[in-house]
């Protein structure tokens, strides 16, 4: 199994367990025991420099676009655990064409060539704005920046590469003090047309809201005065935000040839392991309680209370503590968007299954976990 354009899937689990621990032993321990013995393997992931934070792009993207290079930091997750570069683009209006990216990164220089004839003029204008640079906290023309040279800024599609994700990281803008801010793993925009909440914790109610407010404040760590100094991009709701949102709403999930129209496996196409994994997903694994078919999201927020498993502490500048409710992200196409969880701490689907096996206390055995991963790869 590969990602949509052929990149091999990373395989785990990758977490290093404490001496004397095994996944089987951990799954039999209570949250209190795991917390007391300090053996939880999936603590929140800090920013590479948590005290400074800010947008940070992968090495493969920086090599392609040197304007995104920071002089103070390099990305911390190996390319093997990141989405393919560049990712495919699927449109709800052109399902017959499959990937319309032509294997290219969509930019201001090529967007018209790639999409003229596929989009109407309004959608083309929305896409143009999505690939246009605007000032941002770390990338701007003032002396207060993290790029060597003055910068015109970043584009929406620098993080949401080709309407998917580059796995760029940042710190959420809505928490203070700095040490309490959570790391953010850029989510895909595929399938935003079926989503009703936006932002991992802020619960914005429309893609229009998110598109407009992201550049007014989140681009600048939620600091409105800094935004004014560096160049806030005030988008007009009717003739800019609407156009950008309309294009984003065309971004489709990747094909899932083994799923039927209800989002379940077609038993004539699926393997025995995948069928067993689906049964676990909708029963013992408890996955379906938050991730129902066909898109595998309930469009709600849930508090997993992961703090049951660790003591509050400072790790690499981040004060880890109770994180509160997090948006339920769709699992359709999940194999294309590692790493996982809101901060990217889970590098593979195997890590994700191990994490939830502990957090949900489902006590799955080795075969059940392998089958569940096999099912997730087909979504």
Language-model segments: which ranges?
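Periplasmic c-type cytochrome electron-transfer domains
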Residues: 1-379
